[in-house]
Amino acid sequence: MSATAATYVRAGLRHSVLAVAFVFVAACEHGPARVSPGAPPAPLPQPAPQSTASGYGAVPQTGSPEITYVFGWGDLPAAIARPRGGTTQGAAVTLAPSRRLPLPEIAGARDAFTRDRAAILALAGDYRVSFHFMESVGLTEDYKPIRPYHSWATEHVRVLEDTGRFISLQHTLVMFFRNPDGTPSVPMLTKHWRQDWTFEDADLHTFRGDATWARRRADAGEVAGSWSQAVFQVDDSPRYEALGRWEHRGALSVWTSERAWRPLPRREHTMRKDYDVMEGVHRIILTPTGWLHEQNNWKRVAGERAGNRNDPQFVAAEIGLDRYERITSPSLEVADDYWKKTGAYWAIVRRAWADEIAKRERFALRSSVEGKQLFEFHFGYVDKLESGQPFDAADAERHVRATLSRFIHGPQ
């Protein structure tokens, strides 16, 4: 069992399948298991080719059976070309029919605001998701290419709240694994990430490195016509927030963010020590089969790691493609049952976080308290609700507020 798996098992969650599901989730930078049919290949060790001035590393001559072609790189050792990531097999899915773009609700919208809203609401639904990440540029003298990342999930995205100028979308993983005899497993469900969209948002909290977030105020001219996207972790703690704008031209509907900082994704957190901030621009693109989250990321050193240096220290660039494809089966309706049982608790968590963010110009998060991460305190409580314990709003409020007070620190 990996260290990540052990962490989630220690959370004491009622469903062991929930712990398993988390192993395959790179929270908010999503990710898990391979989608290709057949038994997954055993992972191969990464070779250490001699570095070159270009940073690409020495590779065998073309035609050698030990190399393979990798897009954007050319020929690389086969062990590097083989993706890392999850190794489980998902149950078969039925893809929904493709839709003609622009979507009718976008084409028929009376103004830009209505078109933007229609595009955001179109992100909801049931999906097969595939996660693809590959480093495309190395910037250090001793840089060597690393294996790309490829994983999968089946995910339900629901509209949690819609007040017109604000839309909240909640992601819930509903995973069906393939048993050895080819039959699908029982669904394995867990709360995943959340994305909040706010029109002309002038009050943002952006990631600053070192597990710290700070308020950024924007003027009216900067935010006119824009939408912010705020992304939250599985425990509803903040991850990153960025302004961006939707563009609708013919079949194209795309939201493009400003350049923004993000914490390391979970897929990198335990294996990379050479950088601590992901700086990038990302796009949300509607497609005939669903939508695409495209990322162009720079991996950089910041915060305490940078010491007293003011010049940016970049180590590599990465391309990310998270592809959301609509499905009609298997049914992911068990997500509805989960939210009926736990929704009131998570609403308290969101309100508590909103209060904390509103009163703080800057705050930081402790990584753990008494050996437990923040999500463990929340998921342990939620597990009791899933087991049938009656919901007590006052008790939940006390638990949430007390828990956050132990993890959040910084001036008010």
Task: Set out the residue ranges of the language-model regions.
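Bacterial N-terminal signal peptides that target proteins for export
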Residues: 2-17
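Short helix-loop boundary/capping segments
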Residues: 220-279
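N-terminal pre-domain segments of enzymes
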Residues: 43-110
